[in-house]
Curated annotation (Swiss-Prot):
Compartments it resides in: Plastid, Chloroplast thylakoid membrane
Encoding gene (name): ndhA
Natural source organism: Oenothera elata subsp. hookeri
PANTHER family: NADH DEHYDROGENASE SUBUNIT 1 (PTHR11432), NADH-UBIQUINONE OXIDOREDUCTASE CHAIN 1 (PTHR11432:SF3)
Listed name of the protein: NAD(P)H-quinone oxidoreductase subunit 1, chloroplastic
GO cellular component: chloroplast thylakoid membrane
EC number: 7.1.1.-
Main location, first listed in the record: plastid
Membrane-spanning ranges: 30-50, 98-118, 129-149, 165-185, 203-223, 248-268, 269-289, 300-320, 334-354
InterPro entries: NADH_UbQ_OxRdtase_su1/FPO (IPR001694), NADH_UbQ_OxRdtase_su1_CS (IPR018086)
Lineage: superkingdom: Eukaryota
Gene Ontology biological process terms from the UniProt entry: aerobic respiration; photosynthesis, light reaction
One Pfam family here: NADHdh
Alphabetically ordered keywords of this record: Chloroplast, Membrane, NAD, NADP, Plastid, Plastoquinone, Quinone, Thylakoid, Translocase, Transmembrane, Transmembrane helix
């Protein structure tokens, strides 16, 4: 049997072309994901530096100044130090739960970034249930903290994990009710649709003015979800040494801090998206909607402006969160639970009923 060499070469060339197409498709799929991860990492480093500088200013002392200009590389130096430190395991603890707990906390929060629109053309996944995906995946993080506390075989760690679970349950319900109110106003649960619904009326179309009660409840609940002062009961130093982090060292110890700042950043981004108009500058006389959609260069320029606008609003909320941490005292556990169940839950439920009534009357 004689085989035509030309046909064989054509088949080999076709198979190589198909392989190259598959590889290029995988690369193009990974590029936005890796870009998002890189941007999030830089955002966390900036937040750590900002917190140290702001806390130094509030306490009238000198902040980080040796690692890089103005100490901006101090967080990177701390991360490298933790990578090379020894990872200790508790002798009588559950090593599997102990090891997997920090990873669950970080991964569950990272998934939330997939539905955040940084601009009209920069969102990893525009889902119809975007805001509720955030609630769903963020509720997994306390499970990781509880696993870490239980696997440590330490009473302080276990108590810290229990507090994290109780705090998460108490404040996720008001948070969800606020999200329902926003979804009713926007007639959608997609984060992109919510931002576009606010852009119709400029600055006065922000949900901040239409939902002031919901904004305050969302603000307090998001701070409690991030376990920031005055809501850092799961890791109260005076009572629980370091809570669920007590037995951790090395990179696993660093993962908890990364998860904390990731959660703070994603909460700030959702405040921007849900209440502050997202990527819209909201100056209708200067920036006409659709102005940057005419050419490719215009779309790139508009996307860049949208990213900077989103980040500016986000870091404004971050400044408020950091200032709150260094100015307010910690609540007791009973005060924390009473605030969530006796005050925020009825207020958020009443806000949802008012929103529903107004939407029905407007039909």
């Amino acid at each position: 049997m004689i085989i035509d060499t030309t046909a064989v070469q054509d088949m080999n060339s076709f198979s190589r072309l198909q392989s190259l197409k598959e590889v290029s498709g995988i690369i193009w799929m990974l590029v936005p994901i890796l870009s998002l991860v890189l941007g999030i990492t830089l955002g966390v480093l900036v937040i750590v530096w900002l917190e140290r500088e702001i806390s130094a200013g509030i306490q009238q002392r000198i902040g980080p100044e040796y690692a890089g200009p103005m100490g901006i590389l101090q967080a990177l130096a701390d991360g490298i130090k933790l990578i090379f430190k020894e990872n200790l395991l508790p002798s009588r603890g559950d090593t599997r739960l102990f090891s997997i707990g920090p990873s669950i906390a970080v991964i569950s929060i990272l998934l939330s970034y997939s539905v955040i629109p940084f601009s009209s053309h920069l969102v990893l996944s525009d889902l119809n249930i975007g805001v509720f995906l955030w609630i769903a995946v963020s509720s997994i993080a306390p499970i990781g903290l509880l696993m870490s506390g239980y696997g440590s075989n330490n009473k302080y760690s276990f108590l810290g994990g229990l507090r994290a679970a109780a705090q998460s349950i108490s404040y996720e319900i008001p948070l969800t009710l606020c999200l329902l109110s926003i979804s009713l106003l926007s007639n959608s649960s997609s984060t992109v649709d919510i931002v576009e619904a606010q852009s119709k009326y400029g600055l006065w179309g922000w949900n901040l003015w239409r939902q002031p009660i919901g904004f305050l409840v969302f603000l307090i609940s998001s701070l409690a979800e991030c376990e920031r002062l005055p809501f850092d009961l799961p890791e109260a130093e005076e009572e629980l040494v370091a809570g669920y982090q007590t037995e951790y060292s090395g990179i696993k110890f660093g993962l908890f801090y990364v998860a904390s700042y990731l959660n703070l950043l994603v909460s700030s981004l959702f405040v921007t998206v849900l209440y502050l108009g997202g990527w819209n500058i909201s100056i209708s006389y200067i920036f006409v909607p659709g102005l940057f959609e005419i050419t490719k260069v215009g779309r790139v320029f508009g996307t860049t402006i949208g990213i900077f606008t989103t980040l500016a609003k986000t870091y404004l909320f971050l400044f408020i969160s950091i200032t709150t941490r260094w100015t307010l005292p910690r609540l007791r556990m009973d005060q924390l639970l009473n605030l969530g169940w006796k005050f925020l839950l009825p207020i958020s439920l009443g806000n949802l009923l008012l929103t529903t009534s107004s939407q029905l009357l407007s039909l």
